[in-house]
Regions:
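Sec-dependent signal peptide recognition
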Residues: 3-12
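C-terminal motif of bacterial Sec signal peptides marking the signal peptidase cleavage site
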Residues: 15-18
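Catalytic glycan-binding domains that act on GlcNAc-containing polysaccharides
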Residues: 21-193, 198
């Protein structure tokens, strides 16, 4: 009986690691989706639901968490040495903070959403960018301004021109978004073909 339990535990660990590990090549959207085909289905579903392009979803996740499902902001340090508290409650693929994640769950009815799930994370990004378009009149195809709103929040968006750091980050997201867009145009036909998947 103990051997059976151990075997089940090993299988469970393998399944979890297979689902949660960072894709091997996060710079290539085709490679990401070939390795994690269900991610493609989830991203396409979010795109259809909210109108947020798949390539923008990926670019935001790459910048925010590098596709690490357990990503958190690094701890601040006291006297540059002693580990201290984290600067925010950002967590998971989307790096959503607790308050905004709570708002997302309440507004969408997705009560069981988890920041560690890719499916929920891309849906969150779709929801957020859609609200950005409504509140700030920023197109969901404008990766630069969408990321600024994502990073700074809707209230602080108007002050971004004085923030060189966030401007540089947004430029990187815009560049990565364009790269992902080009890559997806080359593999979308093969990705759209039904596949049998394990993970």
């Amino acid at each position: 009986m103990k051997i059976l339990k151990v075997n089940y535990l090993i299988i469970l660990i393998i399944l979890i690691s297979g689902c949660s590990s960072v894709p091997k090549n996060t710079a290539d959207s085709c490679s990401i989706f070939n390795e994690r085909y269900m991610w493609y289905k989830h991203a396409k579903k979010a795109e259809k639901k909210w109108g947020t392009p798949v390539y923008l979803q990926l670019a935001i996740i790459k910048m925010e968490s590098s596709f690490d499902w357990l990503a958190k902001p690094p701890r601040q340090k006291l006297f540059k040495v002693v580990p201290y508290k984290r600067p925010s409650s950002s967590f998971g693929y989307s790096q959503a903070v607790k308050g905004t994640w709570k708002q997302y769950k309440e507004e969408t009815g997705n009560k069981l959403a988890a920041r560690t799930r890719f499916k929920d994370s891309v849906d969150f990004i779709g929801w957020y960018t859609n609200k950005t378009e409504k509140i700030l009149k920023v197109s969901k195809k404008d990766a630069f301004k969408q990321y600024i709103a994502y990073h700074e929040g809707w209230g602080n968006y108007k002050n971004y021109k004085n923030n060189k750091k966030v401007i540089n980050l947004a430029k990187r997201v815009e560049k990565q978004s364009n790269i992902y867009k080009q890559q997806l145009s080359e593999c979308k036909n093969s990705l759209s073909t039904s596949k049998y998947i394990i993970f």
